[in-house]
Design a protein with these regions (language model features):
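Conserved acidic, metal-coordinating active-site core of Asp-based
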Residues: 65, 72-188
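Active-site phosphate-binding/coordination module
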Residues: 2-99
Length: 188
């Protein structure tokens, strides 16, 4: 790819913290559009090129609205992180935080816990909402009117999990951003 000047862009809904094992297996260091387009990350320079985040005030309003509509829901956030250096426990600092009332419904049991209010103290790439009593489609019907147009609701599995992000954070929009900005060019 590098010899032919063909850029490699990895686009995924997965968080940045999941990607080092992927790019370490590749012959080139790719650009990574991750967290559904909330981040553009240069794996060669180990640098976040662009963030499109939900701001603290927006997050607070969104969490409160959803919590009123779905009091049984559990919350977590994916933050953008400063770099890709782990603190030794496999987690990047401040990346994935779980509201303390939600321990049993998240697969990442070693992730740090915090209060529901503290989830929205800093901007986040994604707000995750889990409700085991409803399907994701049922949840989306309830949540979309509460967050539109401030945020965008998506889900990839119908098991009661929603991902909420900034409305401009999409993989397609970020790919176009990379191309127009010239970040798809061959890198050293």
């Amino acid at each position: 790819l590098a010899e032919r000047h063909i850029p490699l862009i990895v686009a995924t809904g997965r968080p940045l913290r999941w990607l080092p094992p992927v790019w370490q297996q590749l012959p080139v260091s790719p650009l990574c559009i991750c967290m559904n387009g909330a981040l553009i990350y240069d794996a060669f320079r180990h640098k976040i090129l662009r963030r499109t985040l939900l701001q603290s005030a927006e997050l607070t309003d969104i969490v409160q609205s959803i919590h009123r509509a779905l009091p049984e829901a559990c919350f977590a956030v994916e933050r953008s992180g400063a770099d890709t250096q782990s603190q030794g426990d496999g987690h990047l600092p401040g990346e994935f935080l779980i509201a303390e009332n939600a321990e049993e419904v998240w697969y990442e049991q070693n992730a740090p816990r915090t209060t529901l209010a503290a989830l929205s103290e800093e901007p986040a790439a994604k707000l995750l909402v889990r409700c085991t009593e409803l399907s994701s489609a049922e949840m989306a019907e309830i949540v979309r009117p509460l967050v539109d147009p401030v945020a965008h609701v998506t889900y990839s599995i119908d098991s009661g999990l929603l991902e909420i992000s900034h409305p401009l954070a999409t993989k397609g929009k970020r790919w176009r951003t990379c191309w127009i900005a010239g970040t798809c060019r061959r890198r050293p």
